[in-house]
Amino acid sequence: MTMLFSITLPALLGLSLAACTSTPEGSGIVAATGPTEQPKAQKTVENSNDGIYAKIKTNKGMITIKLEYEKAPMTVANFVGLAEGKVKNTAKAEGLPYFDGIVFHRVIPDFMIQGGDPTATGSGGPGYAFADEIHPDLKHTRPGTMSMANAGPATNGSQFFITHKETPWLDGKHAVFGYVTEGQDVVNAIVMGDKMEQVTIERVGKAAKAWDAMKVLADNKDKFRAK
């Protein structure tokens, strides 16, 4: 299913991190003291590796990010939909993966790398903007935090950044939607102009495979507007 937006190219989507100018058990075994009992049935729990992952193949190597689709469903759905070419936008033809070939247009050492702008100018985007989705459990508390770049409230589009370090001053201002699980060394090696050669989405586990990004976007269409 294709998510349809009636949109025009945004006049303003500078997305320059408004707040950034302020400078980013093991289990024990207890011996039985009575008659041996049959073990009780265990509840099935999800594998800790289950989830939705963004695999960003760059010219410097691979970055793997676990996307927080349960806590930031709308933001993750937007990223996934664009990455898989399912969201209609003004930058690329329908069906084409949005992020493939886009460069990291802004890099601040010991702070963050920023990409997702098809024009590489810092003002480009998909032709629409959507509301901030700030979850209290998702904070800029560690290196490898993936968060939305914006030009103020409700101006999210396609630009995102990944941090080199903890950046708590961005909490509440930028929507966190994932964390790097592999490839932080690649994040740290990226310089301005390095390219996202391919961005793919990997779903691991039953819940992740059943999650429908396009349905999430359809359910939240009132939070999107043309730009």
Q: Where are the language model's segments positioned?
A:
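Cyclophilin-like peptidyl-prolyl cis-trans isomerases
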Residues: 20-227
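Bacterial N-terminal signal peptides
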Residues: 6-18
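Bacterial N-terminal signal peptides that target proteins for export
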Residues: 1-8, 146
